[in-house]
């Protein structure tokens, strides 16, 4: 049984001198969280993967990717196909108002002059608009900074993520902290790979076999995340999140294919602050560092 263990240590501190450890306390601009909706049988989706990766590569400390496999194109065709769906993907996709694949939300925001795929006021954008939307977000100031560090204990099977939130100015909006677990270097089939992303083709049992990246595997605090009740300037909030990682994601899902084993050695976490179920204000990514028995390893830390 998948077990999500959450330990929340909330300490609201108006002065950070003795508490803050790795989050920045200097006012900064927003970072981009691109949630890309994709699927193994979406022929144009590899082009979306290329665009998203290009945005990250051009802004490695400011643009973070979450690839969400959901919808009909993500469904396996038979028992030899991996199922990359999660229990969270459909709801996130439906909330975006997406009308085709690939689609993506840039901070779950709406943009003047950029039309969404669906009805007005929805957030899913066609891939040709991701760069322009990202540039707008990167130019906006953020009222909150976020830091994260992550480690996985190979002997206990527990992923631990420490986050720190610091408010550089006051907001009256509801804030929710989310921690997404993403997996890289996941082999599987992919339509359109030869045409749009041949560099991601690897050896393997599918024709072609594709190296999937940034694949959503879990939301450590559920779909709603952790709500913050104090969001005034100078507030510092540390949290510890834990997940007893299962072998695969079969719990709570059925499939026509199979659920591949999870690989903690190829994982990152993307933490982000959103205004309730709405716009993401900023985010940060941290590599998951695996700690082996009798080995000592420092966490990789990221902050914004």
List PLM regions with ranges.
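Short, conserved sequence motifs used for protein processing/export or organelle targeting and
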Residues: 50, 61-294
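Proline-enriched interdomain boundary motifs that mark the N-terminal boundary
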Residues: 31-34, 143-148, 293-303
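N-terminal capping/interface segment
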Residues: 4-7, 32, 98
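Local sequence-structure signature of Cys/Sec-based thiol-disulfide redox active-site neighborhoods
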Residues: 22-71
